[in-house]
Amino acid sequence: MARVKRGNIARKRRNKILNLAKGFRGGNKNLFRTANQRVMKALCNAYRDRRRRKRDFRRLWISRINASARINGTNYSKLINGMKNADIIINRKMLAQLAITDPKCFEKIVSSVSQ
């Protein structure tokens, strides 16, 4: 049976991990075993945080909408309920952007909902 030499394959596998570990601090970037652990942890965190980002941005938008709504004399829940009843379909991202960039337009939305 022929001898199987795996030097190239093993080096490619290690280099792939070490390339992913670029920018890490200390031995985490150039010692394979610790780099491998750090890369696996980083990939787990990235997977988790891709899902968490959606929640975090929604929370941010809601906070911004609530702050602007309170300036205009109402609160978030009344504003959203009024918009739903008035068939105004603007998502929270757009509403938060309006509240920051165009307060007069946001004020008109609040006044139309309050009626």
UniProtKB/Swiss-Prot annotation:
Annotated Gene Ontology cellular component terms: ribonucleoprotein complex; ribosome
GO molecular function: rRNA binding; structural constituent of ribosome
Origin superkingdom: Bacteria
InterPro entries: Ribosomal_bL20, RIBOSOMAL_L20_CS, Ribosomal_protein_bL20_C
Cytoplasm as UniProt keyword: no
GO biological process: ribosomal large subunit assembly; translation
Keywords for this protein: Ribonucleoprotein, Ribosomal protein, RNA-binding, rRNA-binding
PANTHER family per the UniProt record, alphabetical: 39S RIBOSOMAL PROTEIN L20 (PTHR10986)
Function text: Binds directly to 23S ribosomal RNA and is necessary for the in vitro assembly process of the 50S ribosomal subunit. It is not involved in the protein synthesizing functions of that subunit.
Full protein name: Large ribosomal subunit protein bL20
Species name: Prochlorococcus marinus (strain AS9601)
Taxonomic path: Bacteria, Bacillati, Cyanobacteriota, Cyanophyceae, Synechococcales
